[in-house]
């Protein structure tokens, strides 16, 4: 039986949240599965987070399919904080939309994808009232940040359900190609994270 888990992280914003910049921090991790929605304060505050990372690791490793939007970004962040994280399979909704749109839009945004499917759009408050004004993630009130992240995760999950149906009802070769590209994404994430000895 498939156990799907939807993931989203929120980070500090230096270089667009670059996970390879030591200046950045992982602020929150949000997860959604059949057990419901959970969010975890990692470095949003200064509270200890080791136990939370262990819980996240257990939840992620128990899933058979990890869903996200531009999921390689989220995986880089999890790998930075969690050693030896085992991910069985991923579904990148951004990659799926690129394939389903016949590669006409290489980097569709979550908001554009939500709008395309007639779903509730992202909450603009965090971007417009905080990030665009130079206010970093740790300075955003928790209730606003938590609501923003939850809406992103719920929206990503809704997009996944629509995309899955579209793939299942469409050309099976396209679906197989997408699954293969998701496997490739995991390998690419590993290569980018580990680097190369030259």
Name every feature range the model reports, one short phrase each.
Residues 1-17, 55-56:
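Long, highly charged low-complexity segments
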Residues 3-5, 25, 185:
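Residues at beta-strand starts and edge strands
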Residues 5, 27-29, 194:
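Structural beta-strand/beta-sheet cores of well-ordered domains, especially the beta-sheet scaffolds
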Residues 6-7, 91-94, 198:
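Conserved catalytic palm subdomain of right-hand nucleotidyl-transferase polymerases, strongest
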Residues 168-171, 175:
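Non-catalytic accessory segments adjacent to catalytic cores
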Residues 176-198:
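Extended, well-ordered alpha-helical scaffold/bundle regions in very large, multi-domain proteins
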């Amino acid at each position: 039986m498939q156990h799907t888990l939807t993931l989203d992280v929120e980070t500090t914003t230096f270089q667009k949240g670059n996970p390879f910049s030591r200046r950045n921090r992982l602020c929150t991790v949000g997860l959604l599965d059949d057990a419901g929605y959970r969010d975890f304060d990692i470095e949003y505050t200064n509270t200890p987070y080791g136990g939370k990372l262990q819980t996240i690791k257990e939840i992620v490793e128990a899933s058979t399919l990890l869903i996200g939007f531009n999921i390689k970004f989220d995986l880089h962040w999890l790998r930075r904080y969690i050693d030896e994280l085992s991910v069985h399979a991923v579904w990148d909704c951004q990659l799926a939309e690129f394939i389903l749109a016949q590669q006409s839009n290489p980097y569709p945004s979550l908001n554009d994808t939500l709008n395309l499917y007639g779903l509730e759009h992202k909450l603009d408050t965090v971007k417009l009232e905080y990030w665009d004004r130079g206010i970093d993630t740790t300075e955003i009130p928790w209730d606003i940040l938590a609501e923003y992240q939850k809406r992103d995760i719920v929206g990503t999950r809704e997009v996944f359900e629509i995309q899955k149906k579209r793939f299942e009802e469409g050309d099976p070769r396209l679906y197989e190609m997408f699954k293969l590209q998701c496997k490739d994404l995991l390998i690419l994430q590993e290569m980018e994270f580990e680097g190369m000895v030259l």
